[in-house]
Amino acid sequence: MDKKYFFMTIGLTILGTAILFFYSDHFRAFTAEQARKINVLQESPIVPNVTFEDSKGESFTLSEYQGKYVLATFFYATCGDVCPVVEMNFNKIYSSLPKRILRDKLHFISISFDPKRDTPEMLEHHRELYEADGVNWRIATVPDQKELKLLLKMAGVIVIPIENGFEHNAAFYLIDPKGRLIQIYDYNSPDKVVEELNLRVK
């Protein structure tokens, strides 16, 4: 090989590696989802104190949980693919944690991003389906569209309308007692989430 092209190839390889190193956060982020999780760990953004409406039609805000952890996830009630898996695993986490932690230290919220269709009646059906107690695990939505968009953007939740539903990413989101998003968990690893929560929330 001509020396000129050899060194050019070497140079381009080094340049490409350097670019990948920079944009993948030191080779740690090779997908948007991984990058999102790393960003949360680095920044710990404050969660907007939006107003929720739960399955009983009652309004509440995250400020009510100040001093406690909150584990949240996002869904829409008519979802037929990923959401049932997410909620079943959410139930598995909830059922696996000590009652003392659930009573005093940690609350669960399943948040619908489809407030037009997910009325309190729909949310109540969802609550019964996944055996949420409606107290320590609430099923809710955010009626105000501006607040909902703000919340989704903060968490990096992508929601794309399609025929008869939405395409969206899914995960579990841990909010600390100061109202900061501090961890994003894989929804397919409920046992790991339980292990982590037992260590973190005491």
Feature locations, PLM:
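N-terminal targeting signals for export/organelle localization
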Residues: 1-49
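Structural microenvironment flanking redox-active thiols in thiol-disulfide oxidoreductases
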Residues: 87-151
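Extracytoplasmic
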Residues: 45-47, 65-69, 103-106, 118, ...
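Sec/Tat-exported extracytoplasmic proteins
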Residues: 69, 94-101, 130, 152-159, ...
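Thiol-/selenol-based redox modules, centered on thioredoxin-like
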Residues: 158, 162-202
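Short extracytoplasmic
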Residues: 37-70
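Short active-site neighborhood of thiol/selenol oxidoreductases, capturing the structured segment around
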Residues: 60-90, 109
